[in-house]
């Protein structure tokens, strides 16, 4: 077999691999998992919101995270900090938690329907609030015109692009966990209007056990595949093969 034939074969295989990873998809199977913006500091689950004590836990850096299951549940965690142009010493910060169900329509629209009683928001505006931030319920249905999942050619990681209903892109997110790192997909803090169970203490105990179990079983941090390194490994193998062919 000639060197040119070997090189062509290996190059074709590498191009096929990279080309496949760069093709995008918008299926439920590809959407599954926990996605986080570039900093990776914001992740859905018990490290962002404690449903037992109803606490929003501030991450080290701002960011967004969305999680999806194959059977139609979602969770979102948002931490945003906005500068105050009039007074740089007074930035505002907001923490938002929601979870519920989602639906993908035939035209690719992604709709998130949160559980009305479970959403929480913590708003901090130090120049308007002398001491404490404002903690309140939060309920906002979200619609995305479309979404796309593919391997980012630069970072070599699975990437999720969400496009708002007006077509504007959200910050890109990267796969952090699959299956998703999420709180239980049931109503966490039911009210009387939401058909509250008779034994609330028992319900909270079940939620706590579920959270503890999710921390130790079935959830794995997604490893990063460096496709640039894979490409250069292939090139080096071609070069080594060429050298070996030359000295035969």
Curated annotation (Swiss-Prot):
- Lumenal compartment spans: 24-229
Presence of the UniProt keyword Nucleotidyltransferase in the record: no
The UniProt entry's GO CC annotations, sorted and at most eight, read: endoplasmic reticulum membrane
Q: Which GO terms describe its molecular function?
A: unfolded protein binding
Record's subcellular location:
Endoplasmic reticulum membrane
**Which residue pairs form cystines in this protein?**
none
The residue ranges crossing the membrane are 230-247
One BP term from GO: budding cell apical bud growth
Which residue ranges are assigned to the Cytoplasmic compartment in the record's topology?
A: 248
Signal peptide start-end? 1-23
Major localisation: endoplasmic reticulum
Q: How does it sit in the membrane?
A: Single-pass type I membrane protein
Its domain of life? Answer: Eukaryota
- Alphabetized UniProt keyword annotations: Endoplasmic reticulum, Glycoprotein, Membrane, Signal, Transmembrane, Transmembrane helix
Q: Which PANTHER family match?
A: PROTEIN ROT1 (PTHR28090:SF1)
Function field: Required for normal levels of the cell wall 1,6-beta-glucan. Involved in a protein folding machinery chaperoning proteins acting in various physiological processes including cell wall synthesis and lysis of autophagic bodies.
Return the similarity comment: Belongs to the ROT1 family.
Mind telling me what this protein is named? Protein ROT1
Identify the coding gene: ROT1
């Amino acid at each position: 077999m000639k060197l040119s034939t070997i090189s062509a074969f290996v190059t074709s295989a590498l191009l096929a691999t990279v080309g496949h990873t760069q093709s995008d998809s918008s299926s439920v199977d590809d959407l599954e998992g926990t996605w986080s913006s570039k900093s990776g500091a914001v992740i859905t689950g018990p490290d962002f919101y404690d449903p037992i004590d109803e606490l929003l836990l501030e991450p080290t850096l701002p960011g967004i995270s969305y999680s999806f299951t194959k059977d139609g549940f979602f969770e979102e965690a948002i931490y945003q900090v906005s500068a105050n142009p009039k007074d740089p010493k007074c930035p505002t910060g907001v923490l938002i938690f929601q979870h519920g169900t989602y639906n993908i329509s035939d035209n690719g629209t992604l709709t998130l329907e949160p559980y009305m009683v479970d959403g929480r928001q913590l708003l901090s505006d130090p120049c308007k609030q002398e001491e404490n931030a404002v903690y309140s319920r939060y309920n906002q249905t979200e619609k995305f015109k479309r979404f796309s999942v593919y391997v980012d050619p630069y970072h070599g990681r699975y990437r999720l692009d969400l496009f708002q209903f007006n077509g504007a892109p959200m910050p890109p997110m990267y796969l952090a966990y699959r299956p998703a790192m999420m709180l239980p997909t049931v109503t966490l803090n039911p009210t009387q209007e939401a058909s509250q169970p008779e034994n609330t203490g028992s319900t909270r105990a079940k939620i706590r056990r579920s959270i503890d179990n999710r921390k130790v079983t079935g959830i794995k941090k997604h490893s990063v595949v460096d496709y640039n390194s894979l490409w250069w490994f292939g090139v080096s193998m071609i070069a080594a093969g060429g050298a070996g062919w030359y000295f035969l």
